[in-house]
Amino acid sequence: MLSTLSHTRGPNRPLLELTIGGLLDRTASLYPDRLAVASCHQSKRMTWAELTAAADSVARGLWSLGIRHGDRVGLWSTNCLEWIMMHMGCARAGAALVNVNPAYRSHELGYTLTRSRMKALFLWHKDKRANYEEILERARHGLSLELKHTIYFDSPEWPALLDAPGQLPAHVAVDDVANIQYTSGTTGHPKGVMLTHHNVVNNGQFLAQGFHYTEQDLIVVPVPLFHCYGCVIGTMSALNSGAAIVLPNWTFDAHATLQAVHDERATSVYGVPAMYVAEFGLPDFASFDLTSLRTGMMSGAPCPVEDWLRTHSLLLGERWKEAAHILYFGVREVARF
């Protein structure tokens, strides 16, 4: 009876016993000069060798702040190159990165600051959506926090941290917590889900395997990096394969997403159903050259069959029979091994 209910398909690849930092070293040694990240809206690019060096600089900078193995470090930002640097740098330092939703208001931020016990928070002063500095001041008022450092990316503190002397931890274990993500809180208070290095590395391995990613691929990631879709599916599949991460904009923009596919000759694109609908609704949709695409992912919300088939035909054209646009289901709480 059990055999009829439980089964697996596909190759039985062994789980990787690597930390995020160890995987970064492996990928950088294989493809040092290949593109790792392209942040289109910032006009910034990094190779895998450059990203590895940047991660080490972040880790040493965290050490100089007094951040040690197992400490929590918050990141409150929309999509940017600095987000990827912090993701890799915290992992290298053995610190747990706490993803903070950029849409948080002061009471939500205060809850996260308190519950996570983060010792440092990295953020921008403000953007078109919000003044984060003001929200932070309101959030911390009257609270007893462990927060000792606030580092603004758009201040001299950030480059100074990257140049700070420090050291890397002697050992980071695969079962150490790499990432804490807070749930949406629709049925109660948000819960901090703790994801280990072992979890996210192997999630990335099987995603890269399923998409047949190689160092030749470029993955457009318009979904938010603070979410599991962005920081696990978006970054770790690239880290496992040597593919490049392409960030089209700070937040989702349909035109910027298609422009990134067009300009970078991307081979894969991610999104939730509503993002694809917005892209197809652009008046100039037909002006974008999407012929480089061979695969992609739709996740994050229910998807009617009609929308999925439309995505296949419009993004992949006549190639849809040979290509794969994957529907992916999952929740943060069970996104772990």
Predicted regions and their residues:
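Conserved AMP-binding/adenylation subdomain of ANL enzymes
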Residues: 201-218, 228-268, 278, 282
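ANL superfamily adenylate-forming
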Residues: 2, 127-174, 283, 337
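Conserved AMP-binding A3 loop
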Residues: 45-49, 178-202
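Conserved AMP-binding/adenylate-forming core of the ANL superfamily
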Residues: 16, 36-88, 105-110, 171, ...
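ATP-dependent adenylate-forming carboxylate-activation enzymes
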Residues: 77-78, 98-114, 125-135, 243-264
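Conserved pre-ATP/AMP-binding loop-to-beta segment of ANL
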Residues: 17-18, 32-35, 164-182, 189, ...
